[in-house]
Protein backbone atom coordinates (compact mmCIF):
# COMPACT_ATOMS: atom_id res chain seq x y z
CA UNK A 1 0.00 0.00 0.00
CA UNK A 2 1.40 3.37 -1.00
CA UNK A 3 0.43 6.47 1.01
CA UNK A 4 0.75 9.94 -0.44
CA UNK A 5 0.52 12.91 1.93
CA UNK A 6 1.30 15.67 -0.56
CA UNK A 7 -1.26 18.01 -2.14
CA UNK A 8 -1.88 15.33 -4.75
CA UNK A 9 -5.46 14.15 -4.26
CA UNK A 10 -4.31 10.50 -4.43
CA UNK A 11 -4.33 9.17 -0.88
CA UNK A 12 -4.01 5.40 -1.21
CA UNK A 13 -3.04 2.87 -3.83
CA UNK A 14 -3.77 -0.84 -3.59
CA UNK A 15 -3.10 -3.67 -6.01
CA UNK A 16 -6.09 -2.75 -8.21
CA UNK A 17 -7.39 0.57 -6.91
CA UNK A 18 -6.55 4.20 -6.35
CA UNK A 19 -8.36 6.12 -3.63
CA UNK A 20 -8.24 9.87 -3.85
CA UNK A 21 -9.93 12.89 -2.43
CA UNK A 22 -12.98 13.74 -4.51
CA UNK A 23 -13.18 16.98 -6.46
CA UNK A 24 -16.13 18.96 -7.73
CA UNK A 25 -15.62 17.18 -11.07
CA UNK A 26 -16.85 14.00 -9.36
CA UNK A 27 -20.40 15.37 -9.08
CA UNK A 28 -21.77 13.35 -12.03
CA UNK A 29 -20.25 10.15 -10.64
CA UNK A 30 -21.60 10.86 -7.14
CA UNK A 31 -25.05 11.53 -8.60
CA UNK A 32 -25.00 8.11 -10.30
CA UNK A 33 -23.74 6.27 -7.21
CA UNK A 34 -26.14 7.86 -4.74
CA UNK A 35 -29.14 7.17 -6.95
CA UNK A 36 -28.53 3.45 -7.33
CA UNK A 37 -31.24 1.32 -5.78
CA UNK A 38 -28.85 -0.33 -3.31
CA UNK A 39 -27.55 3.01 -2.05
CA UNK A 40 -31.05 4.34 -1.55
CA UNK A 41 -32.21 1.12 0.14
CA UNK A 42 -29.25 0.53 2.45
CA UNK A 43 -27.83 4.01 3.05
CA UNK A 44 -30.39 6.72 2.32
CA UNK A 45 -31.99 8.79 -0.38
CA UNK A 46 -29.87 11.93 -0.25
CA UNK A 47 -32.25 13.76 -2.58
CA UNK A 48 -29.63 14.29 -5.27
CA UNK A 49 -31.46 14.70 -8.56
CA UNK A 50 -29.10 16.87 -10.59
CA UNK A 51 -25.38 17.37 -11.04
CA UNK A 52 -25.78 20.69 -9.21
CA UNK A 53 -27.32 18.83 -6.24
CA UNK A 54 -24.35 16.46 -6.19
CA UNK A 55 -21.88 19.35 -6.39
CA UNK A 56 -23.64 21.00 -3.44
CA UNK A 57 -23.47 17.71 -1.52
CA UNK A 58 -19.72 17.54 -2.13
CA UNK A 59 -19.26 21.14 -0.94
CA UNK A 60 -21.56 20.86 2.08
CA UNK A 61 -21.06 17.26 3.28
CA UNK A 62 -17.91 15.68 1.84
CA UNK A 63 -15.33 18.48 1.65
CA UNK A 64 -15.92 19.89 5.18
CA UNK A 65 -14.90 16.54 6.71
CA UNK A 66 -11.40 16.97 5.28
CA UNK A 67 -11.16 20.49 6.68
CA UNK A 68 -12.44 19.50 10.12
CA UNK A 69 -10.92 16.03 10.62
CA UNK A 70 -8.31 15.53 7.89
CA UNK A 71 -10.18 12.58 6.40
CA UNK A 72 -13.45 11.74 4.68
CA UNK A 73 -14.82 9.72 1.79
CA UNK A 74 -12.43 8.93 -1.04
CA UNK A 75 -13.28 8.30 -4.66
CA UNK A 76 -12.38 4.69 -5.48
CA UNK A 77 -11.19 4.15 -9.03
CA UNK A 78 -9.70 1.28 -11.00
CA UNK A 79 -5.94 1.70 -11.21
CA UNK A 80 -5.70 0.50 -14.82
CA UNK A 81 -8.36 2.77 -16.32
CA UNK A 82 -9.13 5.51 -13.80
CA UNK A 83 -12.80 4.50 -13.95
CA UNK A 84 -14.63 5.56 -10.77
CA UNK A 85 -16.34 2.59 -9.14
CA UNK A 86 -17.36 3.81 -5.69
CA UNK A 87 -16.52 5.66 -2.53
CA UNK A 88 -14.86 4.48 0.65
CA UNK A 89 -13.58 6.41 3.60
CA UNK A 90 -13.67 7.44 7.20
CA UNK A 91 -16.50 9.42 8.74
CA UNK A 92 -16.74 11.10 12.13
CA UNK A 93 -20.42 11.18 13.04
CA UNK A 94 -21.67 13.38 15.86
CA UNK A 95 -23.64 10.45 17.30
CA UNK A 96 -20.70 8.00 17.44
CA UNK A 97 -17.60 8.17 19.63
CA UNK A 98 -15.40 6.33 17.13
CA UNK A 99 -14.67 6.95 13.46
CA UNK A 100 -16.79 4.91 11.04
CA UNK A 101 -15.54 3.18 7.88
CA UNK A 102 -18.02 3.56 5.04
CA UNK A 103 -18.14 2.19 1.52
CA UNK A 104 -20.40 2.01 -1.52
CA UNK A 105 -19.53 0.46 -4.87
CA UNK A 106 -21.50 0.84 -8.10
CA UNK A 107 -23.63 -2.26 -8.58
CA UNK A 108 -21.94 -3.22 -11.85
CA UNK A 109 -18.60 -3.51 -10.01
CA UNK A 110 -19.88 -5.46 -6.99
CA UNK A 111 -18.77 -9.02 -6.28
CA UNK A 112 -15.16 -8.46 -7.33
CA UNK A 113 -13.67 -7.74 -3.89
CA UNK A 114 -13.21 -4.02 -4.51
CA UNK A 115 -15.12 -2.89 -1.40
CA UNK A 116 -13.00 -5.13 0.83
CA UNK A 117 -9.76 -4.03 -0.84
CA UNK A 118 -10.65 -0.35 -0.44
CA UNK A 119 -12.02 -0.64 3.11
CA UNK A 120 -9.05 -2.68 4.36
CA UNK A 121 -6.66 -0.06 2.95
CA UNK A 122 -8.68 2.79 4.47
CA UNK A 123 -8.77 1.14 7.89
CA UNK A 124 -5.02 0.48 7.77
CA UNK A 125 -4.43 4.11 6.75
CA UNK A 126 -6.64 5.32 9.58
CA UNK A 127 -4.75 3.29 12.16
CA UNK A 128 -1.17 3.68 10.93
CA UNK A 129 -1.12 7.16 9.39
CA UNK A 130 -3.95 9.00 11.14
CA UNK A 131 -3.40 7.30 14.50
CA UNK A 132 -7.01 6.26 15.00
CA UNK A 133 -7.34 3.71 17.78
CA UNK A 134 -10.89 2.61 17.09
CA UNK A 135 -12.67 2.29 13.75
CA UNK A 136 -16.23 1.01 13.65
CA UNK A 137 -18.70 0.13 10.90
CA UNK A 138 -22.42 0.78 10.62
CA UNK A 139 -24.91 -0.90 8.30
CA UNK A 140 -28.59 -1.63 7.85
CA UNK A 141 -29.79 -4.84 9.55
CA UNK A 142 -30.86 -6.35 6.22
CA UNK A 143 -27.67 -5.48 4.31
CA UNK A 144 -26.13 -8.96 4.37
CA UNK A 145 -23.31 -8.07 1.97
CA UNK A 146 -22.08 -5.20 4.15
CA UNK A 147 -22.45 -7.29 7.31
CA UNK A 148 -20.21 -9.99 5.78
CA UNK A 149 -17.72 -7.36 4.64
CA UNK A 150 -17.52 -5.74 8.08
CA UNK A 151 -16.95 -9.16 9.62
CA UNK A 152 -14.25 -9.95 7.03
CA UNK A 153 -12.58 -6.67 8.06
CA UNK A 154 -12.39 -8.04 11.60
CA UNK A 155 -15.30 -6.10 13.08
CA UNK A 156 -17.96 -7.79 15.20
CA UNK A 157 -21.55 -6.84 15.93
CA UNK A 158 -21.68 -4.68 19.05
CA UNK A 159 -25.27 -3.44 19.27
CA UNK A 160 -28.23 -1.87 17.50
CA UNK A 161 -28.18 1.93 17.24
CA UNK A 162 -30.20 4.75 15.71
CA UNK A 163 -28.43 7.14 13.35
CA UNK A 164 -30.52 10.15 12.32
CA UNK A 165 -31.22 10.02 8.58
CA UNK A 166 -30.48 6.30 8.26
CA UNK A 167 -33.77 4.56 8.98
CA UNK A 168 -35.14 3.33 12.29
CA UNK A 169 -32.28 0.98 13.17
CA UNK A 170 -28.65 0.33 12.25
CA UNK A 171 -26.12 -2.24 13.38
CA UNK A 172 -22.86 -1.06 14.95
CA UNK A 173 -19.78 -3.23 14.39
CA UNK A 174 -16.55 -2.67 16.31
Task: Give short role names for the model-derived ranges.
Residues 38-60:
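Conserved GNAT-fold acetyl-CoA-binding loop/helix
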Residues 52, 64-67, 156:
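PAS/LOV-family and closely related PAS-like sensory domains
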Residues 62-75:
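A short helix-loop-beta-strand connector motif used in the catalytic cores of GNAT acetyltransferases and
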Residues 1-42, 75-174:
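Acyl-donor (CoA/ACP) binding surface of acyl/acetyltransferases
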Amino acid sequence: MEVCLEMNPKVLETERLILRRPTIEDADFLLELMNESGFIKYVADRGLRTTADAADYLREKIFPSYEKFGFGFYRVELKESGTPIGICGLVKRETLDAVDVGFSILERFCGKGYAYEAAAAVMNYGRTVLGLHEIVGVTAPDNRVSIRLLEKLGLRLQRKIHLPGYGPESLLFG
